[in-house]
Amino acid sequence: MTVILYLCTGLYLCFVLFIIAGLFKHNTNAVKTNNELSKVSIVVAARNEENNIASLIHDLLHQTYPRDKLEIIIANDRSTDQTGAILNEAAAKHSYIHHIQIEECNPEMASKKHALQQAIQRATGDIILCTDADCQVPQTWVSSMASSVKSNGGITIGFSKIAGESFFDQYQMIDFLSITAANAGFGGWKVFWSGSGQNLSYEKKNFDLINGFT
């Protein structure tokens, strides 16, 4: 029993050291700025997000990325609140915001994936940039993610954090940070195991190559 305990402890320590070493490897992979800017399509799936979607739209409208190289496509996934009205108003004011109304489910696909698939199919950008309707993003979000995609083989997994000051929010933040750190550690060795859809970008041609979420 003691031998098994030592063996498990040794394996766990090797696992932790592997992650830590991977985190430091990211320092050598600086993002290179590309002077030739690609068109970026931001895609969002929203369902009953009347309390959050306006804040996200505000952030997206204040990006440093050139507006003529940007489009925002938001798929309203059968919302029963005022999400649709908010999206209609935003699309009427800003020509590069597009509102897609999802009326039916796809029995072979999760509802969010179906909504995202519909949005991506309408995208005209070379780069797809994903976030969630209840997220907030900094002004340099599009610029940094788009540059990173071109420097990292066509896909970039961004960092996200959970906001809030309650005990539950803080607990979630620590739990999510540990998962993200482990994934980033493996990523330093070029073996990412997952990517959160709330901060993810990739080249559209790669999405088309694998036939999307089907």
What is each model feature region?
Residues 38-41, 71:
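Cell-envelope/extracellular polymer assembly enzymes that use nucleotide-activated donors
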Residues 22-31, 49-63:
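Short, well-formed alpha-helical segments that are part of the catalytic scaffolds
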Residues 77, 124, 131-133, 214:
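Active-site acidic Asp-centered loop
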Residues 91, 114-127:
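Active-site nucleotide-sugar/metal-binding loop of Leloir-type enzymes
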Residues 82, 131-148:
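Acidic donor-binding/catalytic loop of UDP-sugar-dependent glycosyltransferases
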Residues 1-36:
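N-terminal membrane-anchoring/stem segments of glycan-assembly enzymes
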Residues 15, 96-119, 144-214:
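Long helical/loop segments within the catalytic core of UDP-sugar-dependent glycosyltransferases
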Residues 57-105:
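Acidic donor-binding segment of Leloir-type glycosyltransferases
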